[in-house]
Regions:
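Extreme N-terminal segment that seeds HTH/winged-HTH DNA-binding domains in transcriptional regulators
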Residues: 1-42
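Basic amphipathic alpha-helical segments that dock to polyanions
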Residues: 29, 40, 51-64
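Short helix-capping/turn signature of helix-turn-helix
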Residues: 31-32, 108, 174, 210
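Short beta-strand(s) of the beta-wing in winged-helix/HTH DNA-binding folds
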Residues: 36, 65-66, 71, 162
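Conserved phosphate-binding catalytic cores of ATP/NTP-utilizing and phosphoryl-transfer enzymes
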Residues: 66-90, 194-215
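Gly/Thr-rich phosphate-binding beta-strand-loop-beta motif of the actin/hexokinase/Hsp70
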Residues: 77-114
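Glycine-rich phosphate-binding loop and adjoining helix at the ATP-binding site
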Residues: 116-215
Length: 215
């Protein structure tokens, strides 16, 4: 039994390291848009054998694509790696004091659907929750009509966020938002995993990934 437990623990550690490597590669591929194996390995200081192992698993899982860039060069042409847009999609809700926005983006980050709506000040938490979840539904419905597999829901919320619980703790400009368990509410309502973070951090991450800050 002890030997079996040790094998399981080692297996879990190996699996955890692989997931970390895949996340690291995927993040770098997102920031690059499209990048060859050689450059990727050099940037991340990863051995060729390790890189090939991780990349192949990501291709097999449908996370990334590998395709010829079509340029004419001597010798073997580079084969860029890029996120696979058909792997699935994410529904995103972004709101603040006076407005809210819902988007659907594919796995490569391309916007497939977007809607804006006014959000009026309110003191009733149940009413606020109903408005927010109803707007999330618009994104869910749009994704389903597109035939896209929904991987999860992201919420960019204003104010103080408890990232551990996904709770909006406090926001000065929406009284009804105090101690709203956004992650729990969204997951129970949609049946999809949800991540909640402060909207300013989300904007900064987007700029770091796709904007001028990536350089």
């Amino acid at each position: 039994m002890a030997n079996e437990s040790a094998v399981i623990l080692r297996s879990d550690r190996v699996s955890g390291k692989m997931e970390m490597r895949k996340n690291l590669l995927l993040q770098h591929i997102y920031r690059s848009g499209s990048i060859g194996r050689l450059e990727l390995g050099r940037d991340l200081q990863m051995s060729k054998s390790r890189l090939c192992e991780v990349v192949q698993e990501m291709i097999d899982e449908g996370l990334i694509l590998e395709s010829l860039d079509g340029t004419e060069r001597r010798g073997r042409r580079p084969v860029p790696l890029s996120p696979n847009p058909d792997h699935g999609c994410f529904v995103g809700l972004d709101f603040e004091a006076k407005r809210m926005r819902v988007v659907v983006v594919d796995f490569s980050g391309k916007t497939l659907f977007q809607r804006h709506q006014e959000l009026r000040p309110m003191k009733d938490q149940k009413r606020l929750i109903s408005r927010l979840l109803g707007f999330v539904d618009k994104g869910i419905d749009a994704a389903r009509k597109l035939g896209a597999h929904i991987l999860g829901v992201g919420v960019a919320a204003p104010g103080v966020i408890n990232q551990t619980t996904g709770t909006l703790v406090h926001y000065d400009f929406i009284e009804a938002a105090r101690n709203t368990p956004l992650r729990e509410l969204v997951e129970n309502h949609t049946g999809h995993p949800c991540v909640v973070d402060n909207n300013i951090r989300c904007y900064a991450l987007t700029e770091w990934t796709y904007g001028a800050a990536k350089n």
